[in-house]
Amino acid sequence: MAGTAAHPEGITNPPIDELLEATDSKYSLVIYAAKRARQINAYYSQLGEGLLEYVGPLVETTNAQEKPLSIALREINAGLLTHETVADSLPPVS
């Protein structure tokens, strides 16, 4: 079968192993990326209203259809974001 090879994007680019180096665990990576993706989504939603409360993508978007999560993962991989681990504020369960 002739044709061009697919160039997958999203969770396969950047590789998950590189993304895990930026966080303590895969769970914190999920939270980290999801929060940033929500900020990017809110930014795009606000553009039509003239409000600029959120910061837009920090990496160049190559495709107008690129999902906010893919953008967030590329930002994390590029080292453009920082995050802090906050101690639980809930008292221990007895």
UniProtKB/Swiss-Prot annotation:
It catalyses: RNA(n) + a ribonucleoside 5'-triphosphate = RNA(n+1) + diphosphate. Keywords: DNA-directed RNA polymerase, Nucleotidyltransferase, Transcription, Transferase. GO terms for cellular component: DNA-directed RNA polymerase complex. Disulfide bonds: none annotated. It is an enzyme of class 2 (transferase). GO terms for biological process: DNA-templated transcription. Belongs to the RNA polymerase subunit omega family. This is DNA-directed RNA polymerase subunit omega. It comes from Frankia casuarinae (strain DSM 45818 / CECT 9043 / HFP020203 / CcI3). The gene is rpoZ.
